[in-house]
């Protein structure tokens, strides 16, 4: 059906280098002719194509006319919020910080109209929790998310949840995904669903959402088919490539009230997206924390968006009205304009494609008797009337925008035009046009050293390892969450070229003498720790979740303790006079000095580790044939292990897991790594709060510092 519709439209439109009557295949963004003499004919074909398509589809705009959906047409700025972002959730204060987050969004970007609560990926897959579990396991559970939604709603911000259709390999719910989505929407008062990796939602999703909450919109990540515009009020315009003369977003052209959010997640210069949104009366997605990789906006991009949003929100009715004229003639080279009209009010949006500031007469338009003219970006009155025409003068910074308004001298409701112009003028005068976008600095948490044990003091159950200098190789799967900063190695700007592929680097490592546990800490050992100390975590959610009423299950005494977070592990280690091993200490203890791939050699061999066939954890000493050169057990499979490798940049906290586990989520490359792993393999694990960080598949072992002389 989609292909046939594309063929139909192809016969109606012309492209950049075509004659006025030659057909080209329509694309999500319809390219405009570079020759301005073809613009009139191009617009006529656009208009004809729209009318014919509406007729062929028997298009009905019922959902766009319903009051509960009216908000979507003016949802210009959507923020993609990583819920583990420390600006969004304060782990020290143990609370969501919605007010602070929105205030920062207001000052930097001009404020958000909606926020996507991104929850599971890239964490999902380390254990069997599914995407709905991740919402349930957020701080405060679903009740906490409902309170968060209330706080956002009080500030006029809409709330989206995320749907990951590829999540089919984790724990299954007793209900279909459609029912689960409706449950989550109802439970937290969500206003929309972001359809990750999808062109469109299932046909029954719309009716199910309408039954639980009015006005819940659907937004697709991938290009939305035109036949689904009727029941999808929003869609992404992702990686769209514009023509030199600004083109038209087809879905926005087809349905003027359809909101599209421009997004190029790995770009630091968002000029192209901003200009596309501006010329199409469309929106932007703000996304700096990309799954744990920082991709910050430049001051110039922020300044343009702040100026845009004030105008778009004030004149939202114009940008969703029928009278839109793409590409009206502009007077300066490299500048382009669109015209929006409603009720006699005219608004022109302009962009400067060039590297130079343009000044002087930007537009010459017909004069309407009695109208005044205003520069909405500079925030001042303008316009020089000459006979039946008016010259609109101003300036546009390099790659900047402009807007002119023609209206009669009647004030609209709300903030007066005078106040609005003053605010726009202040923003324009303070605009920072620099294009650099330095990000927050990543810092490695210092290791809290133990006392230096002498050789005869090495605690039972540990093995002493001499200090060593070596060149160590590290492998990791190139995921969108990135990895940590490696000195001397340029981090990839985006992983799309080799996404999901294993990459590696080597570095010089110097290890001082240390001892490391021969086995992971067991349930029985953790019981003793609790008995001796009375340890109780500040947040008890999921703490030792595999125990029954706080009691260790019989038969698991010698299994690795799991459902402990990094702090739970550190607390045990401190009590034992130890600490967690660093990533490098763990790896050296696993592979020894010859750099072997697995603790037992260079090839994986079934039967030497818990590879999942047991269906859960196994006793820590069950695989004697899988010991490392230093005699350490379980350094491959069974459970991932915490290491003392916590890093953070003020936005994202994470640590490195080693060893792999018995569990591996199957069915999608988007899942986190699982199953037994090589000694040199490291996995980046985003941290948020204990209820999520405690997993059925993560345990730990301890290390201790040894005296350098190794003496008695």
Question: Model-predicted segments: where are they?
Answer:
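Active-site-proximal substrate-binding groove within the catalytic cores of carbohydrate-active enzymes
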Residues: 43, 213-361, 367
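Catalytic domains of carbohydrate-active enzymes, especially glycoside hydrolases
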Residues: 100-120, 187-190
């Amino acid at each position: 059906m989609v292909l046939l519709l594309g063929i139909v439209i192809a016969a109606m439109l012309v492209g950049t280098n075509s004659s006025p009557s030659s057909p080209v295949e329509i694309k999500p963004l319809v390219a405009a002719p570079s020759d301005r003499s073809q613009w009139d004919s191009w617009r006529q074909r656009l208009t004809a194509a729209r009318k014919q398509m509406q007729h062929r589809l028997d298009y009905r705009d019922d959902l766009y006319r319903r009051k509960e959906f009216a908000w979507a047409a003016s949802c210009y700025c959507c923020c993609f919020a990583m819920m583990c972002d420390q600006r969004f959730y304060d782990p020290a204060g143990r609370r969501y910080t919605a007010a602070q987050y929105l205030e920062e969004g207001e000052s930097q970007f001009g404020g958000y109209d909606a926020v996507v609560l991104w929850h599971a990926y890239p964490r999902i897959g380390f254990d069997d929790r599914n995407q709905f579990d991740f919402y349930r396991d957020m701080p405060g559970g679903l009740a906490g998310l409902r309170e968060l939604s209330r706080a956002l709603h009080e500030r006029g911000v809409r709330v989206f949840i995320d749907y990951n259709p590829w999540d089919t390999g984790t724990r299954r719910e007793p209900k279909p995904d459609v029912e689960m989505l409706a449950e989550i929407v109802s439970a937290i008062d969500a206003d929309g669903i972001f359809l990750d990796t999808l062109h469109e939602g299932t046909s029954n999703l719309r009716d199910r959402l309408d039954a639980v909450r009015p006005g819940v919109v659907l937004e697709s990540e991938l290009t939305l088919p035109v036949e689904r515009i009727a029941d999808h009020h929003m869609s992404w315009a992702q990686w769209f490539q514009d023509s030199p003369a600004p083109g038209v977003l087809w879905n926005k052209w087809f349905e003027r009230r359809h909101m599209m959010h421009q997004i190029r997640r790995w770009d630091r210069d968002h000029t192209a997206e901003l200009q596309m949104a501006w010329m199409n009366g469309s929106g932007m997605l703000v996304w700096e924390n990309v799954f744990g990789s920082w991709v910050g906006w430049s001051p110039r991009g922020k300044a343009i968006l702040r100026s845009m949003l004030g105008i778009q929100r004030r004149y939202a009715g114009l940008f969703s009205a029928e009278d839109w004229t793409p590409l009206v003639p502009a007077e300066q080279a490299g500048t382009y304009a669109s015209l929006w009209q409603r009720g006699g009010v005219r608004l022109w949006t302009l962009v400067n494609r060039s590297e130079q500031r343009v000044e002087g007469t930007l537009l010459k338009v017909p004069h309407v008797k009695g109208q005044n003219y205003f520069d909405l970006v500079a925030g001042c009155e303008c316009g020089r009337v000459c006979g039946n025409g008016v010259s609109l003068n101003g300036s546009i910074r390099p790659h900047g925008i402009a807007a002119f308004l023609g209206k009669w001298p009647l004030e609209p409701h709300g903030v007066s035009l005078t106040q609005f112009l003053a605010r726009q003028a202040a923003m324009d005068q303070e605009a920072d046009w620099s294009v650099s976008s330095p990000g927050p600095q990543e810092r490695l948490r210092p290791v809290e050293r133990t006392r230096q044990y002498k050789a005869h003091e090495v605690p039972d159950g540990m093995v002493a390892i001499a200090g060593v200098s070596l060149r160590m190789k590290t492998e990791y799967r190139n995921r969108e969450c990135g990895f940590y900063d490696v000195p001397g190695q340029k981090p990839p700007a985006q992983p799309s070229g080799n996404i999901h592929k294993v990459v590696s680097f080597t570095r010089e490592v110097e290890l001082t003498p240390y001892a490391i546990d021969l086995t992971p800490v067991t349930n029985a050992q953790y019981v003793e720790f609790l008995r001796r100390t009375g340890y109780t975590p500040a947040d008890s959610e999921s703490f030792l979740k595999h125990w029954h009423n706080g009691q260790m299950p019989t038969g698991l005494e010698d299994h690795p303790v799991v459902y402990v977070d990094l702090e739970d592990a550190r607390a045990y280690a401190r009590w034992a006079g130890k600490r967690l091993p660093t990533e490098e200490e763990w790896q050296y203890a696993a592979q020894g000095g010859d750099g072997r791939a697995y603790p037992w050699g260079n090839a994986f061999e079934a039967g030497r580790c818990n590879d999942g066939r047991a269906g859960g954890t196994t006793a820590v000493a069950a695989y004697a044939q899988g010991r490392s050169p230093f005699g350490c057990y379980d350094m491959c499979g069974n459970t991932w292990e915490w290491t003392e490798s916590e890093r953070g940049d003020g936005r994202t906290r994470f640590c490195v897991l080693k060893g792999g586990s018995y569990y591996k989520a199957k069915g999608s490359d988007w899942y986190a790594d699982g199953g037994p792993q090589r000694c040199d393999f490291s996995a980046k694990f985003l941290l948020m709060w204990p209820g999520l960080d405690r997993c059925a598949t993560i345990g730990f072992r301890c290390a201790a510092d040894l005296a350098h002389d190794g003496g008695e």
